[in-house]
Amino acid sequence: MSTYTPPYQLTDAILALSAEIAATVKEITVRGNLSAQPQLHRANRIRSVHSSLAIEHNSLTLDQVTALLNGKRVLAPQQEVWEVQNAFRAYDLLPSLDPYSIDDLLKVHRVMMDGLVMGAGTFRNTGVGVYAGDQLIHAGTPAHYVPEAMQQLFEWLQNTTAHPLVASCVFHYEFEFIHPFADGNGRTGRLWQTLILRKWEPIF
């Protein structure tokens, strides 16, 4: 078993925010089961997909994303339509996914990036970086270390005693730091954080 532990520090502010969020989640849970309110759950899913893809510069509006989920056609670039449709398919997998399974992570990436990139569903075998214009602001973990780094991260997630709110954030940060895929890291990482939180509280 790996002894890897991500470098993070719990501050009073983080603990206070975690307690506040946990209390809010409990209050929502006590008031009513979200799964018994399909319209609210559906609206939340639409907003999640829209906001996640907007970060990736997808230009579709919330109304257009809603229309696509309802099976309607929208006038938009085909790739952006595929991004939305793929994201809905990936989020539909959430109830069946194991947050500690690398195979499930690869499955999600394959669905999320189907038809959008070569090698969807596989870890990258080349270097990758995050750029602001022409400036490199982050270089991902060297490709030959990616499988080992992801294995260590998943082992940590499965064995940590950190609160799920903290663990999900640490996992997401480390996931993006490793940048295991050639593309689609952001949207896949956000979905996986949702999955970790769902394991804690189904309202996510």
Predicted regions and their residues:
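FIC/Doc superfamily catalytic core
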Residues: 1-204
